[in-house]
């Protein structure tokens, strides 16, 4: 399903447009990837699926991105710098809405399936930040530049706002809002891809 939606996005040019929009950031995190290469779109889609906690969607997208990175790899038996950076970002698991985990907790009879929302938000944000900084130091990538600093500022503001919101509402409302936001984002992405594919 998700690889099919990805194919629609590729054929319509949507993924390339999104990758171009984020290219100032992605090109600095992945300096060895040629500017405008389709793999940047695959990386973006994988990160988006991970942030929504859509494990089943993120896996095929991640495999596709890694396959494309391998095609760019000059040493086929050794992981390239972009592959290492992508793997670290992927496995650190930055999640905005942990849908799958909350569903599993609800299925197992947890009294408050959304209790883990803020701890997951904080831990995955910090793990991703530390991972990116560590790999950037090892690969001598300069993170002190305008696009990266703007992105980090926006992410910090967004996460601060989310945490503030969820600390000031009840657990029941937290579950309702989390599910609603995730479903709207998910549905919106699917509709956007279909509409761009139709045109």
PLM regions: where:
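Membrane-embedded alpha-helical segments and adjacent helix-loop junctions characteristic
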Residues: 1-71, 199
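Membrane-embedded alpha-helical segments of transport systems
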Residues: 52, 84-98, 118-132
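Membrane-interfacial segments
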Residues: 9-13, 22, 73, 108, ...
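Signature of multi-pass transmembrane helix bundles
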Residues: 1, 103-199
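Membrane-interface alpha-helices at helix entry/exit sites of multi-pass transporters
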Residues: 33-39, 70-88, 111-119
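Membrane-interfacial helix-loop connectors
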Residues: 55, 59-76, 101-114
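Alpha-helical transmembrane segments of integral membrane proteins, especially early/N-terminal helices
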Residues: 8-19, 82-85, 146-155
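Conserved active-site and cofactor/substrate-binding residues in soluble primary-metabolism enzymes
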Residues: 13, 17-21, 42, 60, ...
């Amino acid at each position: 399903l998700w690889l099919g939606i990805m194919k629609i996005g590729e054929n319509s040019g949507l993924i390339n447009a999104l990758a171009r929009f984020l290219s100032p950031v992605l090109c600095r995190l992945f300096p060895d990837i040629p500017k405008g290469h389709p793999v940047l779109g695959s990386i973006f889609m994988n990160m988006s699926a991970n942030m929504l906690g859509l494990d089943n969607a993120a896996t095929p997208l991640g495999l596709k991105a890694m396959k494309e990175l391998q095609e760019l790899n000059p040493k086929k038996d050794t992981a390239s710098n972009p592959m290492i950076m992508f793997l670290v970002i992927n496995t650190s698991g930055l999640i905005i809405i942990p849908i799958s985990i909350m569903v599993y907790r609800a299925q197992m009879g947890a009294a408050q399936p959304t209790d883990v929302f803020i701890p997951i938000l904080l831990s995955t944000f910090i793990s991703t930040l530390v991972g990116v900084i560590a790999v950037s130091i090892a690969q001598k990538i300069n993170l002190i530049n305008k696009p990266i600093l703007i992105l980090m500022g926006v992410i910090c503001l967004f996460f601060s706002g989310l945490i503030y919101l969820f600390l000031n509402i009840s657990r029941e409302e937290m579950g309702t809002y989390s599910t609603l936001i995730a479903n709207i984002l998910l549905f919106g992405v699917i509709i956007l891809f279909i509409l761009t594919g139709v045109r």
